[in-house]
Each structure stands twice: as structure tokens, then as C-alpha cells.
Amino acid sequence: MNINENYLNLKDSYLFALVAKKVSEYKAQSPGKEIISLGIGDVTLPLAPAVITAMGDAVAEMGRGATFRGYGEYQGYMFLREAICGYYGKKDVHLDKSEIFIGDGAKSDLGNILDIFSTDNTVLIPDPVYPVYVDTNIMAGRKIIYMNGNTENEFLPLPDGGIKADIIYLCSPNNPTGAVYDKDRLKLWVDYALENDAVILFDSAYEAFVRDRELPTSIYQIEGAKRCAIEFCSLSKTAGFTGVRCGYTVVPNELTRGVVPLNELWLRRQTTKFNGVSYIVQRGAEAAFSAGGYAQIKESIDYYMENARLIAEALKALGIWFAGGENSPYIWLRCPDGMSSWEYFDALLTRANVVGTPGAGFGANGEGFFRLTAFGDRDDVKKALDRIRNI
């Protein structure tokens, strides 16, 4: 028996697991210290009342013989797919319900979508980058080419005509940098993909945090994107579903390679390897897209974005360069005093008892930078900022 030796090419530990390990070790060495995390992007506010009510009603349904439900539809219940179609319609993006696949979060689908692509495809990935994009392709043994994100291009890499790629990862608003592609720059990627017969895997998990109405919140707002892009979205940060688990993937019927519709390939993959998201969770997700539910969710988003404003204000006062925080819950800052990413991590942890995420963990171009998130409790955020000011 042979193992998949590609796994041996992975880093020893997933970035956020490594951060958690270091924090745990520090706590053991310094008992009684109050640690405040502005690091991993988990939410802190509870689910919206409309979501709780819908899930409670669904639980009651499951307790009655007449309304009990077993296995659900492979693509997700029609009521949720219809709600998502309505949500996209407000963006002037028209989807068919057959193009929407309900899953347990963007992370899973971003990794699993690779099942429908050959392992000899060349993958183009931005650097800095969410580690899942890299690790899942290393696991499969694909060739990876990195495109440089830096202060000169505002951490928004653009196509290089001299590079030929088959699969392209884009995330906007970006994790970790908080940068957001405008329509003109995103159109350059769509044109590149169409010219090179490539497929864009577009992570829009943070689209609900975009406040500038001129910025796209779906790649399908760009002409031609339905012929070259798959979009992944999640309710984790938008609706507080990090522990509930629900997201969706859009695979347009227009998207084919050769004569093969990728929608059919993904459906075949899902019917074989995935049994769907629970009815109770999907009813909660449906409520999140209702008028009343979304208004409640918007209050949570506004709360987190006020946290982002406070973080940005503090960094400005300290003279620290940063990006993000305006249309994204992430703030990407340059480490002060020439410190490396992990040196700044250690300084914040030991001197301020504050946790963030070292930029180097997101790729070589992240060295010297650091990510803070706006998902904390307001009082904790204020306390953390006071500590940062005082070191």
C-alpha cells in the first residue's frame, strides 16, 4: 500500500492551528493572562433572531411524522436556492436554480471542486493567499504558479500575458489583505480566462462587507464571467454560521470545457461524495436571505465594520501603514520597526496579550505584514487597541 506522497510536501501545520498552538503554549507558561484574539476570523455575535426562529420551527417540523424529512435534495432544498437566486437578482445577476449548490461552507467546496479538474492543470494563486487554496493543490500534486501581491499593486495582482494557467484563484474582498477588485480590474481577469480557456475559482465569502456600491460583489457582474468562473460564497461571516455550517457554490450552465458542462460534473461529484446540509440549517439560511433576516444580519455586519473602523483609526494614530477595513473585515498592516511577521506576533502576544495572524503564514509576500480581524467583541477590541498603543 502506498500513501499520497504529495501530503509530505505540505507545511508541518495549518497556519491557524500553528497560531493556536503557540497561544496555548504561552498560556501554559503564563497562567492568568487575559488573551484577546484579533486573529482567526471567527465571529462573536449570536445568530439573528429570524434565523433562530426559522431553525426552531424546522426542529419542530422534524418532530412530527407529517412534516419529518430525511435525506434532502443533493443540490439543496429548492426554497433556499430560490432565496439565493433572489439575492443575486438584487445585484442584477440572474441565476437559474440549477446553477446553485448548497454546501457546508466555502472552504469545503473550494477544496472539493478540484475533483472535477485534472491534476495536470497549472494553477495560478495570489500571494499572499488563504492557505486552503495552496494546500489543496499541493495535496493533488498540481503545478502552482504564484502571482505577486504587494503595496505597488495594492495587493490586487493582475494578469500576466506571458503566463498560461488553467485554474485561477481570486478572492475579493480578499482574505488576508482586505483588498477589493473593482470592475475594470476584475474584467481583465475574466478576459484572460476566456482567452486562455481557464477557469476562475472566485471566493466571495466576504461580499456582504462591501460598502462601496461601485465595487462588484459577484464576479457575474462582469460580462462573460458565466463562461469562465465558479463562485463560492458562505454564510459563516455574513450570518454568523461558522459553527452552523452553510454556504453555496454557483456553477453556471454556460460554463463548459470542451463539450462538457462543468455544472454536470460538479453535480455528479456531489451526488457521489456529499449528502447535503441539514433541513434545519437550510431553513435558517433561507431566513438569512429574507428581508427581515437580512436587515438583522446587516446590523451584525455594521457592528463588525465599526470594529474595523476603530482598528484603522488606532493604526493611523500610531503611524502604521495598513490596507483593508473599509470594504472588508480584515486589516492588513505593515509590521512596525522592521519586525518580521512572527516577531511581531510574539511581541503582541507577550507584551500586549493580543493575538493576530502573521502575514508570512499567507505566503512569501506576506512577510513583514500582519492580519487583524474585526470579528471580536467591541469591548475586547477597544481593550486590545489600548494595549497595542501602550507597547
Describe each region flagged by the PLM.
Residues P46, Y304-M305, L318-R351:
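Conserved PLP-binding catalytic core of the aspartate aminotransferase-like
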